[in-house]
Amino acid sequence: MVNSCCGSVCSHQGCGRDLCQETCCRPSCCETTCCRTTYCRPSCCVSSCCRPQCCQSVCCQPTCCRPRCCISSCCRPSCCVSSCCKPQCCQSMCCQPTCCRPRCCISSCCRPSCCVSSCCRPQCCQSVCCQPTCCHPSCSISSCCRPSCCESSCCRPCCCLRPVCGRVSCHTTCYRPTCVISSCPRPLCCASSCC
């Protein structure tokens, strides 16, 4: 029987296709002949068996998300962990708050769901990602200065460089003492906290 061959004897003799059963998926049996798309089962998703050909929906789980399994066919939300957060995994299906790490913050991954403190990079400061939850000092650049980003941590002089008040950076929600500079002292900016 197959079950009786799934021990040390099986690992020494070699793992053939007939031995690649769910009960026989051991680290010692995860060779090229056993780790195939037809035999990639959840019980085979171990560190030694995490091969590119095993990165299917049934095997792409948090316990199987290793760097060598992070390929385009394995980029799924369940694989969005720190060890699998690669640039090629930053797609719409993998760009979630649990996957927003600094090394995943590329231009193709700048989405509202990725706007967290660790992903707030200049290349993510677009209209779709510039939200109050993403307004951090590291995002205080000219391309990210928008009314929704005017918080205490984002209201810096570099955000108050628009010539016309009431537009973009010089908005009523952004009038704070740190924003009062020579290029932005308009009557509209004279709020109680900004006078």
From Swiss-Prot:
Parts of the chain that traverse the membrane: none
Main function: In the hair cortex, hair keratin intermediate filaments are embedded in an interfilamentous matrix, consisting of hair keratin-associated proteins (KRTAP), which are essential for the formation of a rigid and resistant hair shaft through their extensive disulfide bond cross-linking with abundant cysteine residues of hair keratins. The matrix proteins include the high-sulfur and high-glycine-tyrosine keratins.
Region called 27 X 5 AA repeats of C-C-[GIKRQVHEL]-[SPTR]-[STVQRMC], residue ranges: 5-163
Sequence repeats: 5-9, 24-28, 29-33, 34-38, 44-48, 49-53, 54-58, 59-63, 64-68, 69-73, 74-78, 79-83, 84-88, 89-93, 94-98, 99-103, 104-108, 109-113, 114-118, 119-123, 124-128, 129-133, 134-138, 144-148, 149-153, 154-158, 159-163
Record keywords, A-Z: Keratin, Repeat
InterPro entries associated with the record: KAP
PANTHER family according to UniProt: KERATIN ASSOCIATED PROTEIN (PTHR23262), KERATIN-ASSOCIATED PROTEIN 4-11-RELATED (PTHR23262:SF183)
Family, similarity comment: Belongs to the KRTAP type 4 family.
Protein name: Keratin-associated protein 4-11
One CC-aspect GO term: keratin filament
Natural source organism: Homo sapiens
Distribution of this protein across tissues and organs: Expressed in the hair follicles.
Known partners and oligomeric status: Interacts with hair keratins.
Domain of life where this protein originates: Eukaryota
